[in-house]
């Protein structure tokens, strides 16, 4: 029986933990990134999002750029991040200027790569991640062992 580790957030820590501790494969061995691997989430929002089958995850009515109110999860107070208002998720890895990722990852669209054209590339990226999540859940229904990995924020 194969083992599939799926991160349920709260930041990228669970995905890293899963890869470093053999709970899931790494990309080089075929792992497909899932929606909660590289973002700042919260467990109630994750549960609601899964119950909604990701219906509002990339919905235009719930996406905006928001200033982070505090330092947490590798983000800096005042940093402007893509935010889902329904689930209270921050998409920090695709936000303008976060950690200089647009430079280090060579985003072809520059600093606004994921927010231009009404978040078109953000939606494309996360739709792929949602499909990977669904595929892994289906594999679990077909006999693979699924291990959900979740961290929580401690104030």
Language-model features: locations:
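Extracellular glycan-modifying ectodomains
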Residues: 1-155
């Amino acid at each position: 029986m194969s083992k599939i580790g799926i991160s349920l957030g709260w930041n990228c820590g669970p995905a890293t933990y899963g890869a470093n501790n053999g709970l899931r494969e790494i990309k080089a061995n075929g792992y497909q990134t899932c929606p909660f691997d590289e973002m700042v989430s919260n467990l109630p929002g994750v549960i609601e999002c899964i119950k909604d089958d990701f219906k509002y995850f990339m919905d235009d009515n719930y996406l905006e750029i928001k200033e982070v109110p505090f330092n947490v999860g590798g983000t800096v107070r005042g940093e402007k991040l893509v935010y889902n208002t329904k689930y209270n998720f921050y998409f920090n890895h695709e936000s303008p200027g976060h950690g200089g990722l647009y430079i280090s990852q060579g985003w072809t669209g520059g600093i606004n790569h994921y927010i231009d054209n009404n978040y078109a590339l953000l939606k494309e990226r996360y739709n792929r991640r949602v499909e990977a999540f669904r595929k892994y859940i289906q594999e679990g229904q077909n006999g693979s062992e699924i291990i959900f990995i979740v961290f929580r924020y401690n104030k």
